[in-house]
């Protein structure tokens, strides 16, 4: 007769859960603080609003587990602004993306990086911040999956980070674009694209975050 512990482990495996160690992991929210103010943004606004609920839940679970959250954000051409002004701009009711930005707005405990281009790594302090935090695994989420999320994933892969990209926490202009981006991340970049509800944060006994030399 199988022991009860073995049965429980088998049940969890059959449920398709993905264990994610707390130590060495960071949650990255890419361009979720976003005014979404461009021609033809209506469909993306709708998709982003649907994405906000599972992403907010994932962030809550990550924070409770002790996983740091880093906002990677465009400055929308406001070169004299800081992140606080960017948030204020995006949560204003005049912004098409204000519902998403309000639901996913950062807290005082979160980190943020402003990016000048598509990738969160290009000409930013992200790599240095991740190294300082001892991060070797990144959970990539946000807007748009086929552009900024994918560009960031490419750069993360080239820097030997393990990639998670929960499919329900990433949106693009079209479903086809999003599916293509997720396939690229899953197949080419060897990332895990399971839905966020399958990610299970756990603390390994005696584990320590590994820093690169």
Language model feature labels by segment:
Residues 23, 41-73:
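A short alpha/beta connector and helix-capping loop motif
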Residues 26-36:
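Acidic-leg catalytic submotif of subtilisin-like serine proteases
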Residues 1-4, 41-44, 85-87:
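Short, basic, glycine/proline-bearing loop/turn elements
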Residues 35-37, 77-84, 102-112:
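Short, basic/glycine-rich phosphate-binding loops at helix/coil junctions
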Residues 31-33, 75-76, 117, 144:
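Short, flexible active-site-adjacent loop segments at beta-strand->alpha-helix junctions, enriched
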Residues 68-69, 74-88:
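Early exported N-terminus immediately downstream of N-terminal targeting peptides
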Residues 1-26, 57-65, 89-213:
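Active-site-adjacent betaalpha module
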């Amino acid at each position: 007769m199988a022991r009860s512990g073995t049965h429980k482990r088998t049940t969890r495996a059959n449920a398709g859960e993905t264990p994610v160690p707390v130590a060495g992991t960071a949650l990255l929210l890419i361009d979720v603080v976003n005014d979404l103010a461009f021609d033809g943004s209506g469909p993306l606004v709708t998709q982003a609003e649907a994405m906000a609920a599972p992403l907010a839940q994932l962030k809550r679970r990550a924070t409770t587990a002790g996983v740091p959250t880093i906002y990677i954000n465009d400055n929308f051409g406001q070169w004299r602004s800081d992140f606080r002004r960017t948030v204020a701009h995006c949560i204003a009711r005049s912004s098409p993306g204000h519902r998403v930005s309000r639901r996913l707005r950062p807290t005082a405990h979160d980190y943020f990086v402003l990016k000048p281009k598509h990738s969160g790594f290009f000409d930013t302090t992200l790599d240095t911040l991740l190294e300082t935090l001892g991060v070797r695994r990144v959970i990539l989420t946000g807007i748009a999956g086929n552009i900024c999320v994918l560009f960031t994933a490419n750069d993360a892969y080239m820097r030997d980070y393990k990639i998670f990209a929960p499919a329900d926490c990433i949106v693009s202009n079209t479903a086809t674009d999003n599916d293509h981006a997720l396939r690229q991340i899953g197949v080419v970049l060897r990332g895990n694209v399971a839905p966020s509800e399958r990610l299970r944060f756990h603390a390994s006994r005696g584990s320590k975050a590994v820093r690169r030399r």
